[in-house]
Amino acid sequence: MYKSINQWSFAGGMDAKACLLAAKAAGFAGFEPAFDAEGPLSPKAGDSGARELRALADSEGVRLPSLASGLYWQHPLTAESPAARKIAEDIVRAQLDCAAALGVGAILVVPGTVGRGFWGGSECTAYADA
């Protein structure tokens, strides 16, 4: 077992590379980057950002156990609209591609919210329907 920390634990505006280095400096053996709408780890980015982060992690001796994403708060897999669900499905595919390029063994997918939305404006689904 080892200690790992998520990218969201760091100040907003820090990129994944800076967070990885800060995690190492703080004594963490692992770092969980976040897949986002924009940036080097995003659906639009391709593999280059993931490969660069993997290379940095390897050179620094930091493990990358998984890849998180908060994109499902705005684009839930449990959305009522088929078009909205298709967007979420495309995000899952892109996140899996990024995870493969990073060499991580797991991704975080929050398929939707029930009851009250966690994120402002996120669509909530009845528990029985989720």
Predicted regions and their residues:
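A short, structure-level motif marking secondary-structure boundaries and short turns
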Residues: 3-6, 37-40, 79-82, 120
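Aromatic-lined carbohydrate-binding surfaces of glycoside hydrolases
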Residues: 71-74
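Acidic (Asp/Glu)-rich catalytic clusters
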Residues: 19-27, 44-67, 93-103
